[in-house]
Regions:
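Helix-hairpin-helix
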Residues: 402-424
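Thr-biased low-complexity repeat/linker tracts and other Thr-enriched repetitive architectures
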Residues: 613-720
C-alpha cells in the first residue's frame, strides 16, 4: 500500500505525545493500524503493551478484523477497547481485590437504569415519567458527569433547561437508588476508575507498567473525564497517540469538546501535531463546498481538506413544498442512481426516519437502518393527542381527563378536579363541572365551549383532528408555554402525525400504522440493502456514493434550542454536524429543505442558504449568539451598490451617502435613505462594514421580533428592526440594542425618522 508523506510521518512516530489531525476520508484508521505494526516490528514493542481506545465496540471489532486480515499471526494479542470497557476492567479488578460489590445497570435490556428509575419514581410519587422527561434527565446527567460538573450547579446556571425542579428530583432519586442498591452505570465506571487511580498508587503503577503505548481513535469524541483518566496513566512518558478531527466533534451532549484538542499543546508541551489533509473519499467540489461550510466556525484548528481527484460531481439543492413532496423527490432521484451504488439518507432528528420509512414502504424499497431510538408512539406529544382523542370518544372518563385538563388552556383548578370524584359514573365531565356551585361567567363559558369542542372533535376525520386539537382546544397554547427551550419544534411532530394520517379514519388505525412502521424499522436493521437511512450522528465514520441530507429546516437543523440559547459553541457544533453529513458523500450530494411544516411556512436552514448562495461576492455572515446569516453582496447593476436579502424579505439597499454628515444609509421598502452612523460620543459602534470599516457582521435574526441584526467589536449583538406593526405608529421606528459582553450591560436606543 502506498502512503502519503503525511501518513508516513504519523505511522513512524515512536515516543511522546502526538495529535494527528485527520480530515474526512484521509485514511486515519489505516494509519492507526499500521502504526501498531510499526511499533511491534520496528521498535520491538510487545503487543501486550499497546492499547487502542475506540469510540464504539463495533468500531473496535472492525479495526481488529482489518488488522488481523493483514497480520493473522497476532490473533488474540492486540487490544482494542472502548474507554468504558477499559475502565470496567480497572474497576472490576480493583473491586475484586478490595471485596467491593456493585452491579452494572447498563448494557442489560432487562435490568437497566431507565426502567429502574421509572419504576422507582412511580412507586415514590405515583406518577409516570414520560420518555422525553427521562431522556432529558439522563442527557443532562451524563453530560455533567463526563464534563466533571456539579449537577445542581449546572441546573442553576443554565436557565434554558425546562422543568429544572423535576430534573433535580430525579437526580436525588437516581443517586439514592444507586447508593442503596450498590448499582453503578457507565458514568460511574469512568468516575470510579479516575478515583481509584488517583488514590491507589499501586494500581496506577500497575497500569503504567502494563500499557506503555496508548492510541486513541476519534479523539474529538473523548470527554473531559476520559482525557483525564488517560492523562494520569500515560504520565510521565506521555506515549499517547491521538487521531482526531476537531471539525467532527459532535458529541458535546456526552461531554466531548474540541477544546480538548485545541488545548493539546498546553497539556503536552512537547507534543507533535501532524496534519493529514488529503481527502481520498470525496470529489473536488464536495470537498471545496464542505471546506467553505466548516470555515464558518471559529473554535477550530485552521486547516483545509485537499482533493486527490479532479473528478467533478453533483451537488443538488431542492426546495419543495412539504415533506410529502420531499419524499417523492427522494424516490425519483434514487430511481435515477445506479442500483450498485450506495445511498445514505441522513437527518438531524430521529423523527425524520418515519417520513422516509413510510414512503419506502409504499414504494416497496428495501433499506437498512443502523438504529432507531425514536419511539414515536411513546412520545409525550403523541400521548397527549391520544388522550385528548380518547376523551372525545368518552367525555365521562375522569381518569383520562385528569391527564389532559391542565393542557387545555382552561385554567381548571385542582379543587374542581377533586369535586369531580363524586360525579355520576356516566356523566360528562363538563356537565359535572357546570353543575359546580359559584362558577363565574369565565368558567361557565369555558366549560360550555370545551364541551362543544370535544363533541365536534369526535365527529372529525383523523387528519382534521390534529389542527383542531392544536388551535381550537388550546393544546397549542400549552405547548408554546412549555416548549420554549425544547430541542424539537412540535410542529414537526404534528406534521408527521398528519402525514401518517392520510386516508385514516380512526386513531386506532393510526396506532396500528405506527406498529407496522415500527416492525419495518426493526427488520431494516438486519437488511443487506445498499440504501441506508440514518441520523447524522450514527453515520459518522461511514461513506456513501450518494448522500441525501433531508429536512434542512430552520429550528430543526440547527435545532430550536440552539438558536434560542445564544450560545456560539452550540451553533458551531451544529455546523460541525452538517459538515460530517456532507463529507459522507463520495460522488453526489443532494440537499433538501421544505417550505411548509404542519401547513405553516418555515425557513430553510442557514446551512442550506449558505450553500445556495456560495457564489456571491461576500459570504453569509452570522454573529456569535446563534443567529442565522443574511446575505451581503455587491449589487453591480444599481447606483446603490451594497445589498442584502434574507428569506421572504425584499432586497434592502445599503449605500454610502457622501454629502450628509451621517454617511451610512440603507433603503428599505418605501423608506429610502434611513441613516445609520457611528456617533463617537455613544457606545454604538459602526453599524455596517463597508469601505474602510471591515469586520462588522450583518445577519437576519429570524427567531425574535427584532429581525435585522448586526454585531461589531465587543458588542456581540446589535439589534435593529423596523416596527411596522406598532399600533397607531406614523413614524418609522428603529430600535438599537447593544450588548457589551465585557460587562454584560445592555443599552437601548430609539430613533425616529418622519418620512413623507
Amino acid at each position: 500500500m502506498k502512503f502519503t508523506n503525511q501518513q508516513i510521518d504519523a505511522i513512524n512516530h515512536f515516543k511522546g505525545p502526538a495529535l494527528i489531525l485527520a480530515v474526512p476520508g484521509s485514511g486515519k484508521t489505516t494509519v492507526l493500524l499500521h502504526r501498531i505494526l510499526n511499533l511491534i516490528k520496528n521498535h520491538n514493542i510487545d503487543t501486550s503493551e499497546i492499547i487502542s481506545i475506540t469510540f464504539s465496540k463495533s468500531q473496535g471489532i472492525d479495526m481488529e478484523r482489518r488488522f488481523l486480515v493483514q497480520n493473522p499471526e497476532f490473533k488474540g494479542k492486540i487490544t482494542f477497547k472502548t474507554i468504558h470497557a477499559f475502565c470496567y476492567e480497572i474497576v472490576r479488578n480493583y473491586m475484586k481485590l478490595k471485596n467491593i460489590k456493585k452491579t452494572l445497570i447498563e448494557g442489560n435490556n432487562e435490568f437497566n437504569r431507565i426502567l429502574i428509575l421509572k419504576r422507582s419514581y412511580y412507586q415514590k410519587y405515583y406518577k409516570k415519567l414520560s420518555d422525553d422527561e427521562i431522556n432529558d434527565f439522563f442527557s443532562i446527567y451524563d453530560f455533567t458527569k463526563n464534563k466533571m460538573f456539579d449537577f445542581e450547579e449546572y441546573l442553576k446556571k443554565n436557565h434554558f433547561i425546562s422543568n429544572r425542579t423535576l430534573m433535580l428530583k430525579l437526580y436525588v432519586l437516581y443517586d439514592e437508588i444507586k447508593f442503596n442498591n450498590n448499582f453503578m452505570d457507565f458514568n460511574d465506571l469512568l468516575i470510579l476508575a479516575n478515583e481509584y487511580i488517583s488514590t491507589d498508587k499501586k494500581l496506577l503503577r500497575a497500569l503504567k507498567n502494563r500499557y506503555k503505548f496508548f492510541q486513541i481513535d476519534e479523539g474529538q469524541d473523548t470527554s473531559t473525564l476520559q482525557f483525564e483518566i488517560i492523562r494520569k496513566i500515560v504520565f510521565p512518558e506521555n506515549n499517547v497517540f491521538i487521531v482526531a478531527d476537531d471539525d467532527q466533534s459532535i458529541y458535546s451532549f456526552r461531554g466531548a469538546s474540541p477544546e480538548n484538542l485545541l488545548n493539546f499543546k498546553s497539556i503536552y508541551p512537547d507534543s507533535k501535531i501532524f496534519f493529514m489533509d488529503k481527502n481520498f473519499r470525496s470529489t473536488k467540489n464536495i470537498i471545496s463546498v464542505s471546506n467553505k461550510i466548516i470555515q464558518g466556525n471559529k473554535i477550530r484548528y485552521e486547516k483545509f481538506s485537499k482533493y486527490t481527484t479532479e473528478e467533478s460531481s453533483q451537488i443538488m439543492l431542492f426546495k419543495v413544498k412539504n415533506s410529502m413532496i420531499q419524499s417523492r423527490e427522494i424516490i425519483k432521484k434514487i430511481c435515477e442512481i445506479n442500483p450498485n451504488e450506495t445511498i445514505g439518507i441522513l437527518y438531524r432528528n430521529n423523527i425524520s426516519s418515519l417520513y422516509v420509512a413510510e414512503v419506502f414502504k409504499n414504494n416497496n424499497i428495501d433499506f437498512f437502518i443502523k438504529e432507531n431510538k425514536f419511539d414515536f408512539y411513546s412520545n409525550r406529544i403523541l400521548n397527549d393527542i391520544k388522550n385528548i382523542i380518547l376523551f372525545s370518544e368518552d367525555t365521562s372518563d375522569l381518569d383520562v381527563f385528569k391527564r389532559i385538563y391542565f393542557k387545555l388552556n382552561a385554567y381548571i383548578k385542582k379543587d374542581f378536579i377533586s369535586k369531580l370524584e363524586y360525579k355520576s359514573y356516566n356523566q360528562c365531565v363538563f356537565e359535572s363541572l357546570l353543575d359546580l356551585d359559584e362558577l363565574n361567567d369565565f368558567y361557565i363559558n369555558k366549560f360550555t365551549s370545551l364541551r362543544n369542542d370535544f363533541k365536534r372533535l369526535k365527529r372529525m376525520k383523523m387528519e382534521d383532528k390534529i389542527d383542531y386539537i392544536l388551535y381550537e382546544i388550546g393544546y397549542g397554547d400549552y405547548l408554546d408555554n412549555f416548549n420554549d427551550f425544547s430541542n424539537l419544534n412540535y410542529n414537526l411532530i404534528f406534521d408527521l402525525i398528519k402525514y401518517l394520517s392520510k386516508n385514516i379514519k380512526t386513531f386506532d388505525e393510526f396506532i396500528e400504522k405506527l406498529e407496522i412502521l415500527k416492525e419495518i424499522l426493526k427488520k431494516a436493521s438486519n437488511s443487506k440493502s445498499n440504501i441506508s437511512i440514518s441520523t447524522i450522528h450514527s453515520s459518522k465514520g461511514l461513506e456513501y456514493d450518494n448522500v441525501f441530507i433531508i429536512d434542512l429546516v430552520d429550528g430543526e437543523f440547527p435545532q430550536k434550542s440552539v438558536l434560542n440559547s445564544f450560545d456560539e459553541k452550540l451553533l458551531e457544533e451544529e455546523r460541525r454536524l452538517f459538515y460530517v453529513a456532507m463529507t459522507r458523500a463520495k460522488k453526489r450530494l443532494f440537499l433538501f429543505t421544505i417550505k411548509e411544516r404542519n401547513n405553516l411556512p418555515v425557513d430553510p436552514s442557514i446551512f442550506y442558504n449558505e450553500l445556495k448562495n456560495k457564489n456571491t461576492t461576500l459570504p453569509w455572515c452570522f454573529a456569535s449568539g446563534g443567529y442565522p446569516g443574511t446575505l451581503l453582496f455587491h449589487n453591480k447593476n444599481t447606483t446603490l451598490p451594497w445589498c442584502f436579502s434574507s428569506g421572504e424579505y425584499q432586497v434592502t439597499l445599503l449605500f454610502h451617502n457622501k454629502n450628509p454628515t451621517l454617511p451610512w444609509c440603507f433603503a428599505s421598502g418605501g423608506y429610502p435613505g434611513t441613516l445609520l452612523f457611528h456617533n463617537k460620543n455613544t457606545t454604538l459602534p459602526w453599524c455596517f462594514a463597508s469601505g474602510g470599516y471591515p469586520g462588522t457582521l450583518l445577519f437576519h435574526n429570524k427567531n425574535t421580533t427584532l429581525p435585522w441584526c448586526f454585531s461589531s467589536g465587543k458588542y456581540q449583538v446589535i439589534l435593529l428592526f423596523h416596527n411596522k406593526n406598532k399600533k397607531g405608529a406614523k413614524l418609522l421606528l428603529f430600535v438599537f440594542c447593544s450588548i457589551n459582553t465585557s460587562n454584560n450591560t445592555k443599552n437601548s436606543y430609539i430613533c425616529n425618522w418622519n418620512r413623507p
